[in-house]
Design a protein with these regions (language model features):
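Glycine-rich and polybasic anion-binding loops at the starts of cofactor/ligand-binding domains
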Residues: 1-196
Length: 196
């Protein structure tokens, strides 16, 4: 069952679900997917990712990347941005890291509206649409104009598969303003023995 999202992201999710209904899952006859049997992924019972997990800071510490103590660390749990486990170590005049919902409702609303899901315009397929439809409140990163951000931004994507197969759809929108530089490293981690 589809979960209705309030606010500006609701229309984005609704359009993506309509696109998925029209496009369906890609099959081997689609060039980009000819070596993948995507339908096999959906034979298991799926759990849509939620924040309600037992993942703690102690769990996170096991997966931290090198020099994490000086980097900005942004955490997704089951596809949902988790500010409580995230640490922004850059100054606000250099880097903004907020929820996608906050960006869509604030100073970056126009940018979010113009760019969120833009890749579907030139790469329409069912998996892309499904990802967008179930992308819960994601992450927005903005590197401010002219700023050279020397320390990296680490994004940790944790899937807690202990309760079962997790269908998590992390979504990050990055805005690098003119003459700014930014380094981002992402890590994908599954906790538990089930697939995610």
């Amino acid at each position: 069952e589809e979960k209705k999202k309030p606010g500006p992201l609701a229309g984005f999710s609704d359009k993506a679900m309509a696109d998925f209904r029209k496009l369906g899952l890609p099959a081997m006859r689609h060039e980009e997917w000819k070596y993948a049997r995507v339908s096999n992924l959906f034979r298991n019972d799926l759990r849509i990712g939620t924040e309600e997990t037992g993942i703690t800071q102690a769990d996170m510490d096991k997966f931290r990347l090198p020099d994490a103590d000086s980097a900005t660390e942004l955490v997704f749990i089951n596809g949902i941005f988790n500010p409580a486990l995230s640490v922004v170590r850059h100054l606000p005049e250099e880097l903004i890291a907020i929820s996608l919902e906050e960006a869509a409702n604030g100073d970056y609303a126009e940018f979010v509206q113009a760019n969120l899901g833009h890749s579907a315009d030139y790469h329409p397929d069912g998996i892309h649409a499904l990802n967008a439809a179930f992308a819960n409140n994601g992450l927005f990163i903005a590197a401010k104009k002219g700023k050279l951000i020397e320390k990296p931004v680490y994004i940790y994507n944790l899937s807690d598969s202990r309760p079962g197969f997790i269908f998590a759809q992390p979504r990050t929108l990055v805005h690098v303003e003119a003459a700014a530089q930014l380094q981002i490293a992402e890590q994908y981690i599954t906790i538990g023995g089930n697939e995610s």
